[in-house]
Amino acid sequence: MLGQSIRRFTTSVVRRSHYEEGPGKNLPFSVENKWRLLAMMTLYFGSGFAAPFFIVRHQLLKK
């Protein structure tokens, strides 16, 4: 009896919850503005690419 009521509650909660659906709606960032997306991706990937070079430069300049 208790198990059935718990099962009904969990399925009704899942059924009542609704999220936006469609391309790009399940991402943690917005893809609506392509120029902002380009800038954010450039910063993200560019910082990862440039970090080793800055670290080597820092080590070479260190006395």
Curated annotation (Swiss-Prot):
Q: Which domain of life is it from?
A: Eukaryota
What are the boundaries of the transit peptide?
Answer: 1-16
Q: What does the UniProt entry say about where the protein is found?
A: Mitochondrion inner membrane
Q: Which GO CC terms are listed, alphabetically?
A: mitochondrial inner membrane; respiratory chain complex IV
- What InterPro entries has UniProt attached to this entry? COX7C/Cox8, COX7C/Cox8_sf
Q: What main location does UniProt list?
A: mitochondrion
Which parts of the chain does the record assign to the membrane side Mitochondrial intermembrane?
Answer: 61-63
User: Is NAD among the key words of this record?
Assistant: no
- According to the UniProt entry, which residues carry N6-acetyllysine? K25
Does the record's keyword annotation contain Mitochondrion?
yes
Which parts of the sequence lie on the Mitochondrial matrix side of the lipid bilayer?
17-33
Membrane-spanning ranges: 34-60
Its keywords, alphabetically, are:
Acetylation, Membrane, Mitochondrion, Mitochondrion inner membrane, Transit peptide, Transmembrane, Transmembrane helix
What does the record give as its pathway?
Energy metabolism; oxidative phosphorylation
How this chain assembles, per its entry, is: Component of the cytochrome c oxidase (complex IV, CIV), a multisubunit enzyme composed of 14 subunits. The complex is composed of a catalytic core of 3 subunits MT-CO1, MT-CO2 and MT-CO3, encoded in the mitochondrial DNA, and 11 supernumerary subunits COX4I, COX5A, COX5B, COX6A, COX6B, COX6C, COX7A, COX7B, COX7C, COX8 and NDUFA4, which are encoded in the nuclear genome.
User: What name goes with this protein?
Assistant: Cytochrome c oxidase subunit 7C, mitochondrial
